[in-house]
């Protein structure tokens, strides 16, 4: 059995760890509320522009933007959204597991893949896996800014416009609630009205000043909105997962401290009993 001093040192070490995890839990809870507010603010706009862009895929117009044209897929692009930091449970590993499955699927179909990584965890994973990384952005902080994302994403959009890739996918973690986050993998381009729930009715819009300028601008905004929404969803998921993970760690530390105190008390009781036995034995010998 360990000595009383060793057990006391262990208890002190676990108590210090619990203080850290408790502080991280409180910080994550504060950041989680702000991240959820940003995510909820982005959702209505993202869903609306997704629906309008979906209607455009069924619209009656002579001009067809490349984002609306389906073509045979010889190469695909992937935008992978992960967190910059860890200590958020299985958030990143669950998403990366889905990404690996999709990458194997593309490989089995003979499709080449090029990746854009948003977040340090996904970037490191893609580097280790040997995937072709054409752009990446890290260090977004607690507040996502579209200006920081556009440069990395534009590389993929230019590749799509130039015919270097024939489809663009995005993987991120969707926020369901504080206790549940869901890894998702969606096709961003080419845009399909059926995929976003747009009715198959042939929509007939009146464009001012002309169809090309309106559609070009709208579809770029569609991509930007969905990228921003994905990052906002992922950040809300990250802070929620981190808060839950740190709470679990704090609770486990409390349990360990209780167990160690029980062991310490037993060791102390055994030492006292031994000393009393030695005293009694010595007195009897005299």
From Swiss-Prot:
One of its GO terms (molecular function) is proton-transporting ATP synthase activity, rotational mechanism. One of its GO terms (biological process) is proton motive force-driven plasma membrane ATP synthesis. It comes from the Bacteria. It is a peripheral membrane protein. The keyword Chloroplast does not apply. It is found in: Cell inner membrane. Keywords: ATP synthesis, Cell inner membrane, Cell membrane, CF(1), Hydrogen ion transport, Ion transport, Membrane, Transport. Its main location: membrane. CDD domains: F1-ATPase_gamma. GO terms for cellular component: plasma membrane; proton-transporting ATP synthase complex. InterPro entries: ATP_synth_F1_ATPase_gsu, ATP_synth_F1_gsu, ATP_synth_F1_gsu_CS. PANTHER family: ATP SYNTHASE GAMMA CHAIN, ATP SYNTHASE SUBUNIT GAMMA, MITOCHONDRIAL. Produces ATP from ADP in the presence of a proton gradient across the membrane. The gamma chain is believed to be important in regulating ATPase activity and the flow of protons through the CF(0) complex. F-type ATPases have 2 components, CF(1) - the catalytic core - and CF(0) - the membrane proton channel. CF(1) has five subunits: alpha(3), beta(3), gamma(1), delta(1), epsilon(1). CF(0) has three main subunits: a, b and c. Belongs to the ATPase gamma chain family. This is ATP synthase gamma chain. The gene is atpG.
């Amino acid at each position: 059995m360990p000595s009383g001093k060793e057990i006391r040192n262990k208890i002190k070490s676990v108590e210090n760890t619990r203080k850290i995890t408790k502080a991280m839990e409180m910080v994550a809870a504060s950041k989680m509320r702000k991240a959820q507010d940003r995510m909820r603010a982005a959702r209505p706009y993202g869903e609306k522009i997704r629906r309008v862009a979906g209607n455009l895929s069924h619209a009656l117009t002579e001009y067809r933007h490349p984002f609306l044209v389906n073509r045979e897929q010889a190469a695909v692009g992937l935008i992978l959204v992960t967190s910059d930091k860890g200590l958020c449970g299985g958030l990143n590993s669950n998403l990366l597991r889905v990404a690996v499955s999709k990458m194997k699927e593309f490989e089995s179909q003979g499709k080449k893949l090029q990746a854009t990584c948003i977040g340090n965890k996904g970037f490191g994973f893609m580097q280790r896996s040997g995937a072709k990384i054409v752009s990446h952005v890290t260090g977004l902080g607690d507040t996502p800014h579209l200006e920081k994302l556009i440069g990395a994403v534009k590389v993929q959009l230019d590749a799509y416009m130039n015919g270097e890739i024939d489809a663009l996918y995005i993987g991120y973690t969707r926020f369901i609630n504080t206790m549940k986050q869901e890894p998702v993998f969606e096709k961003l381009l080419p845009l399909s009205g059926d995929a976003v729930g747009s009715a198959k009715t042939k929509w007939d819009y009146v464009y001012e000043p002309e169809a090309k300028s309106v559609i070009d601008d709208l579809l770029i905004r569609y991509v930007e909105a969905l990228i921003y929404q994905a990052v906002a969803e992922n950040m809300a998921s990250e802070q929620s997962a981190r808060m839950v993970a740190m709470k679990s760690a704090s609770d486990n530390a409390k349990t360990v401290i209780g167990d160690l105190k029980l062991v310490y008390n037993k060791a102390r009781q055994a030492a006292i009993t031994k000393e009393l036995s030695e005293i009694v034995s010595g007195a009897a010998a005299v």
